[in-house]
């Protein structure tokens, strides 16, 4: 083998070695992209969130508005219940405002949801599951802590005794729910369905106090005028 041939084969060998390295680097980056976990203070169906993680108030809210007074709301028809999550009775207008959720929407965006009871959330690019990191300072009106146990309790309550619309959504969308810590809970969604809206859907479920229902023995399915 002459010197020219030797140099040619040496260069060819180095080329193939470099190509193999680049190939595996590309595969690694693709795998990272597929499995990359997004951590955020909210989630949007369309594009980017309007508000960043340290926003102090919504643009349409006056942070210096006077506190106190009363609000009068009109609505068609009548009501005999302040429990909007049971089939019994006709619930009053705005009766759902007494219940909070992990996420909440805004009035100046479409398809965006931000942490309310949840401080932050984690989910993969394909949105096949979501983890909610809850605010440890969150409490119910009776001053009892609001924890992942309450979220799990609420999920099961809605699944077994909630409105048919809630049961249908849960049955169609949610595969499993796991408590990962006192203030951390994971929703895994069913395969074979569009996942774009599922993290926000799971985060919108109302949260009920497990302590209240266990201690009082209250019937979740009963109509009541007690908020």
Report each predicted region and the residues it spans.
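Bacterial N-terminal signal peptides
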Residues: 14-28
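Aromatic- and charge-enriched surface segment that lines or borders ligand/interaction sites
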Residues: 61, 87-94, 120-164, 178-180, ...
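Surface-exposed binding/hinge segments that line
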Residues: 168-221, 225
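Hydrophobic membrane-targeting alpha-helices
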Residues: 24-32, 133, 158
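N-terminal lobe/hinge region of extracytoplasmic solute-binding protein
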Residues: 34-126, 133, 156, 223-227
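N-terminal secretory signal peptides that target proteins for export/translocation
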Residues: 1-14
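Short, surface-exposed helix-loop/turn micro-motifs enriched in polar/charged residues
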Residues: 113, 166-169
